[in-house]
Amino acid sequence: VEWSSNERSTITSLWGKINNAEIGQVALARVLIVYPWTQRYFGQFGDLSSIAAISGNPKVAAHGKVVLDGVEKAVKNLDSIKATYTKLSQLHSDTLNVDPDNFKLLGDCLTIVLSAKFGAEFTPAVQAVWQKFLSCVISALSRQYF
């Protein structure tokens, strides 16, 4: 993937405003609430029986931060996203057996959370660059499946 200087700037500028713990928790909670079948991967998280339980679950919060910390690796390695995610893709496909469609669901929820957080700053132009970036991340995470 080729990144223009404007795209690089847009991604790093947006990412610089993101609190990984805050956004990660809200995005992962949204996935678990909106797509309840994804909860099957998180049985060790305890109570996921309601919106309040999911939103207040410390394990959801902690893993949400882990997820965003992982996305941050792509931000810092825009020219080698696939290589950056090789081991993580293997883990999710070979060990955790995560359906790769769930990466898209998480990306969609993350985009919604960012739009809500940043409002008018999250312009269509910013979203277009963000979607390109997320597509690369999702492709890299799904790489071991195919």
Curated annotation (Swiss-Prot):
Tissue specificity of this protein: Red blood cells.
GO terms of molecular function: haptoglobin binding; heme binding; metal ion binding; organic acid binding; oxygen binding; oxygen carrier activity; peroxidase activity
Domain Globin: 2-146
Keywords recorded for this protein, A-Z: Heme, Iron, Metal-binding, Oxygen transport, Transport
Any GO CC annotation of this UniProt entry: blood microparticle
Entry annotated with the keyword Iron: yes
SUPFAM superfamilies: Globin-like
A Pfam entry, by short name: Globin
Signal peptide: none
Biological process annotations from GO: hydrogen peroxide catabolic process
Residues holding heme b: 63, 92
CDD domains in alphabetical order: Hb-beta-like (cd08925)
Subunit structure: Heterotetramer of two alpha chains and two beta chains.
Functional description taken from the UniProt entry: Involved in oxygen transport from gills to the various peripheral tissues.
Record-stated family: Belongs to the globin family.
Protein name (Swiss-Prot/TrEMBL): Hemoglobin subunit beta-1
Source organism per UniProt: Muraena helena (Mediterranean moray)
